[in-house]
């Protein structure tokens, strides 16, 4: 069983290496270069966190997520308070 797993790992590792070395530059798909542009945009050293380097939609989505998380934490605090302090009748 151990030899089978080693053979599978070896076949995957050597195939990927051969495949990348054998492909000429003119046969690389356009999508690869588009992905490289996006990676360069997100890896720029501009002091902004990665989750804020996207578009305005990403920024709004981040702020809405933080706001909803704070509302949820506040709701849990209120629930714990109401359950721990009984109402006076």
Swiss-Prot record:
Keyword Transmembrane in record: yes
Pathway(s) it belongs to: Energy metabolism; oxidative phosphorylation
CDD domains named in the record: Cyt_c_Oxidase_VIIa
Signal peptide: none
Residues in compartment: Mitochondrial intermembrane: 82-89
InterPro entries: Cyt_c_oxidase_su7a_sf, Cytc_oxidase_su7a_met
SUPFAM superfamilies, sorted: Mitochondrial cytochrome c oxidase subunit VIIa
GO MF term (any one): oxidoreductase activity
Membrane topology: Single-pass membrane protein
Predominant location: mitochondrion
Quaternary structure note: Component of the cytochrome c oxidase (complex IV, CIV), a multisubunit enzyme composed of a catalytic core of 3 subunits and several supernumerary subunits. The complex exists as a monomer or a dimer and forms supercomplexes (SCs) in the inner mitochondrial membrane with ubiquinol-cytochrome c oxidoreductase (cytochrome b-c1 complex, complex III, CIII).
Stated role: Component of the cytochrome c oxidase, the last enzyme in the mitochondrial electron transport chain which drives oxidative phosphorylation. The respiratory chain contains 3 multisubunit complexes succinate dehydrogenase (complex II, CII), ubiquinol-cytochrome c oxidoreductase (cytochrome b-c1 complex, complex III, CIII) and cytochrome c oxidase (complex IV, CIV), that cooperate to transfer electrons derived from NADH and succinate to molecular oxygen, creating an electrochemical gradient over the inner membrane that drives transmembrane transport and the ATP synthase.
Protein's recorded name: Cytochrome c oxidase subunit 7A, mitochondrial
Phylogenetic placement of the source organism: Eukaryota, Metazoa, Ecdysozoa, Arthropoda, Hexapoda
């Amino acid at each position: 069983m151990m030899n089978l797993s080693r053979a599978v790992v070896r076949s995957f590792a050597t195939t990927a290496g051969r495949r990348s070395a054998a492909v000429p530059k003119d046969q690389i798909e356009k999508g690869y270069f588009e992905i490289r542009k996006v990676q360069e945009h997100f890896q720029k050293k501009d002091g902004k966190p990665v989750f804020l380097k996207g578009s305005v939609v990403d920024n709004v989505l981040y702020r809405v997520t933080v706001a909803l998380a704070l509302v949820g934490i506040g709701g849990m605090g209120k629930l714990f308070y109401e359950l721990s302090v009984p109402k006076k009748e």
